[in-house]
Amino acid sequence: MSKIETITKPKLSVVLASQNACRSVSECLGEIEKQRNEDAIEIIVVDNSIDGTQEIIARNFPNVKLVRASKDKFIPELWGIGINQSAGDYIAVTTTHFIPAKNWIAEILKKQEAEYAGVGGAIENDAQGGLVSWAVYFCRYSRYMLPFADEDAEDFAADNASYKRDGLDRVKQTMENGFWEVTVHQAMKKEKMSLLLTSDIVVYHHDSFTFRGFMRQRFWHGRQFGSTRASSIPTSKRAMFGLLSPLIPFILSLIHI
């Protein structure tokens, strides 16, 4: 673990999941550290990389709390570890594959002064990104491309999100196996908490995966989400969904016509 500054009570905890981000981690953490100013902010990186990312963080960012995680952890599980170790009144979540805009922390703190329990932001792609980078972006993040109007939301990507701690504490039972944002957001809405999607908080996606790595990640994330969701559904209903699953491509096609 890195040597870190002593912060009695952080106002904001920035929790970053980190997987094989040696090409972007320095720019990501460098930008966040520039924005700390006089605010009491802690930065926690939970990393399970095999490409030297941990060594870069330990060498160049001594004021960052580096938590080393096992190689089999998914990004939402890394977030969960970091959130459990955080102490801020507010918690911002992203990954080391994203470079925050220069006003990222200021806008997060501003939006957290409102009544929203959670706030999601815009995600842009690096203009110099390659074919795979753009494919990943359009598959996963195009919904959050600028411009768009601010709106009350049901869900948003945790790759650019922030929350009030007391809001997360109210749904902490959903985070026993990691911070899977869809599940967390559904629980927050059931508790009558408000969520906001805003264009004022922006991050930029950099090359995050190889094509093979992204396909593997999507498969295992989908499997984990499906397993978690199915565990709360009666066996008879699961069987019915399984029998009807061949209709999914046709239903999706009709929706998008």
Regions from the PLM with identified roles:
Residues G30-A40:
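Short, acidic, metal-binding catalytic loop of nucleotide-sugar glycosyltransferases
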